[in-house]
Amino acid sequence: MDRKEQKAIIEGLLFVAGDEGIYPEQIAKVLEVEVEEVLNSIEEMQKECEGSNRGLQIVQYAKVYRFATKKEHASYYQKLIDTPTAASLSQAALETLAIVAYRQPITRTEMEEIRGVKTDKALQTLVSHLLIKETGRAEGPGRPILYGTTKEFLDTFGLKTLDDLPPLSEENEQMNEADLFFGSLQELSK
């Protein structure tokens, strides 16, 4: 195999190895070449990554090589890490979010009546993820806080407007809002 193909395979092996990394001896065994040849190819690849506008570099930690992101782009990677995802929310938070999405503006007490359990922790989580916010105060004793969804909610779930939420049909009116919401998300992701 030529050097170009060898470097392509090494690149793939580094990717497959992930954060664990891979020993040059392992690469040499896979490629059926000497370790020195692997080290030379990796060195060339490191220089190529340094000299170009690439987001990745090849680093060596504790005798293994792996891909790592470049420090100069760290602020962008942090934005991705800080972006909330549905996968990072608990079942209780997702159920509460579904209720808010379909019934907004809604008070905490109304949410608890629908769910049948307290929603304090779920509300805190959703507010901290910027998926819901206070939208005002309800009339009545104590003037309870009203909650509604945010732009981040729309972005996170790939919606342009709340009108993109599937409508509640007559047969679905008896369904739990959370079940309907999860079904709706599955439809949106197809």
UniProtKB/Swiss-Prot annotation:
Subcellular location: Cytoplasm
Example of a GO biological process term: chromosome separation
Transmembrane segments: none
Domain of life from the UniProt record: Bacteria
Record keywords, A-Z: Cell cycle, Cell division, Chromosome partition, Cytoplasm
Family note: Belongs to the ScpB family.
Function of the protein: Participates in chromosomal partition during cell division. May act via the formation of a condensin-like complex containing Smc and ScpA that pull DNA away from mid-cell into both cell halves.
Quaternary structure, from the entry: Homodimer. Homodimerization may be required to stabilize the binding of ScpA to the Smc head domains. Component of a cohesin-like complex composed of ScpA, ScpB and the Smc homodimer, in which ScpA and ScpB bind to the head domain of Smc. The presence of the three proteins is required for the association of the complex with DNA.
UniProt protein name: Segregation and condensation protein B
Provenance organism: Bacillus mycoides (strain KBAB4) (Bacillus weihenstephanensis)
